[in-house]
């Protein structure tokens, strides 16, 4: 007989979901505040900024499948290993975000700084996001519990979006950097105390093209 899973409490939800706040906080300033900052403070054209943002984001998107496979390997090794990588990624998210708004260079070197900062921030953000979401997926449970897990993560993310829409504009980018760093520390700290999945036996990985055989999956991609 298998032992019933422990109920997923509100405290469990907060410990798992809290990291969703800083993860949601990151994106809005990069897409809304950063272009205006570089245009006003450094005189960079919006077209150039858009090209750099698009190029670095495309690179990150191309690497996402590899990040996912690496996350699977981390969890197969141990949850502690995944948590360690998440903590390191959180440090680079905070450093990259702060560096983007405190560029010490001008001219062509400034664009290099911008591209490097975006690559570091995007990649670290992707690693942290994939680990966080995989952590929640591995908690398992019935449909009701899985819904609660996602609701806590996305609910905390909603607060992150609201904070990101106010803090940089009202209090400045230094305050935004401080809020991001502090909430990352709290989020990773709470994640370390959140429920963990039991060790799972997994078979060989499925073929990468398998999702394309699903009509609902193809319909979902059509939205994008």
Predicted regions located by residue number:
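Membrane-embedded alpha-helical bundles of multi-pass transporters/translocases
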Residues: 2-224
């Amino acid at each position: 007989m298998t032992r019933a899973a422990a109920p997923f409490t509100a405290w469990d939800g907060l410990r798992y979901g809290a990291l969703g706040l800083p993860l949601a906080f990151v994106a809005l300033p990069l897409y809304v505040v950063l272009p205006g900052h570089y245009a006003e403070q450094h005189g960079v054209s919006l077209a150039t900024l858009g090209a750099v943002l698009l190029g670095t984001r495309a690179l990150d998107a191309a690497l996402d499948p590899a990040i996912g496979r690496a996350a699977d390997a981390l969890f197969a090794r141990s949850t502690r290993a995944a948590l360690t990588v998440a903590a390191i990624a959180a440090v680079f998210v905070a450093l990259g975000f702060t560096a983007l708004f405190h560029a010490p260079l001008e001219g062509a070197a400034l664009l290099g700084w911008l591209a490097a900062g975006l690559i570091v921030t995007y990649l670290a953000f992707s690693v942290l996001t994939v680990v966080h979401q995989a952590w929640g997926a591995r908690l398992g449970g019935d449909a009701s519990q899985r819904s609660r897990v996602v609701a806590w993560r996305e609910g905390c993310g909603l607060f992150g979006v609201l904070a990101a829409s106010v803090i940089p504009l009202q209090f400045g980018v230094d305050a935004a950097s401080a809020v991001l760093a502090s909430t990352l520390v709290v989020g990773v700290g709470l994640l370390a105390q959140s429920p963990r999945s039991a060790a799972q036996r997994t078979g060989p990985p499925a073929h990468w093209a398998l999702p394309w055989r699903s009509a609902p999956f193809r319909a979902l991609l059509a939205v994008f």
